[in-house]
Structure formats: structure tokens, C-alpha cells
Amino acid sequence: MFCPFCRHPDSRVVDSRTSDDGLSIRRRRQCPECGRRFSTTETASLSVIKRNGVVEPFSREKIVTGVRKACQGRPVTDTDLAVLAQRVEEAIRATGASQIEANDIGLSILPPLRELDEVAYLRFASVYQGFDSLDDFESAIAQLRVAHAATPDADAL
């Protein structure tokens, strides 16, 4: 790795530690030429294949932005959205794939969003899964009610 100060083509790793809840590695490096220290961050690249075939880098912020619309007017904080986006990214990275289709990201969002807020879940699912009629909503609500009945301390819908 080139030193950002003197452009020497080598550096020595002084310290390494995980950051971003284990999704990246932060390394402190020292240049053997000028002796100055600098930090680098390493992450495994993850790309998204969009519906039109375009490939772009994965962005947690896009998840937050998309889910925020479904959560408008709901008791969901920015911290809740950040945690949800992190959970989605962790689930995607756990697959071991370096590329993922946008559709699969949407499917990965649904379970943690359902746990976070069921109304936001219905809003997101209605757009994402293309609900066309009241029957689609009724079916989704019926599934939520069945899940509530199976959970002893669940709130009623």
C-alpha cells in the first residue's frame, strides 16, 4: 500500500481491529520511509444487480431511505432504521455472495421490518410485492394474525 504522505510503495501494519460491528477491518499502518502513520479500512465488496441489469455498489443508506418511507408517521427512530439496515446487510453478507439481486435485498428487508413495525411492514410489502387489491392486504393481515396467535405475548392487530 502506498504511503499517502510520501508515496513510498510499502507500509507496515501496526494494529488491526474490526469495526462497523465486524463488517470491516480498520488497520493502523506506518510508512518505513517517512515514519508517519495512517489508517485504512477494508471491507468485502458487495454489489447489487438492479432489475435493469445495472450493477452498483451496495448501500445501507438506500435501505434506510426506502424503509423510512414505509415508516412515515410510525414510532420508528433513525436508530431503529440503522439497526434494520445493518441486520439486512449482515444477512446478505452471510450468504457469501459478492453480488446480489435487488429483489433479494427487498426480501431480506421484510422479516426484520415485520418485527420492527407491522404497519410499516404492510406498507413496504404492498409496494414491494405489488399488492393489487384489498384481497392482497387481507391475506397479508391474516398471515400477521396467524403469527400473532402463535406468539403467546403478542399484541392484537
Curated annotation (Swiss-Prot):
Pfam families: ATP-cone, Zn_ribbon_NrdR. GO terms for biological process: negative regulation of DNA-templated transcription. Keywords: ATP-binding, DNA-binding, Metal-binding, Nucleotide-binding, Repressor, Transcription, Transcription regulation, Zinc, Zinc-finger. Residues 46-136 form the ATP-cone domain. Its cofactor is Zn(2+). A zinc finger (unnamed) spans 3-34. One of its GO terms (molecular function) is ATP binding. Binds 1 zinc ion. Negatively regulates transcription of bacterial ribonucleotide reductase nrd genes and operons by binding to NrdR-boxes. PANTHER family: TRANSCRIPTIONAL REPRESSOR NRDR. Belongs to the NrdR family. This is Transcriptional repressor NrdR. The gene is nrdR.
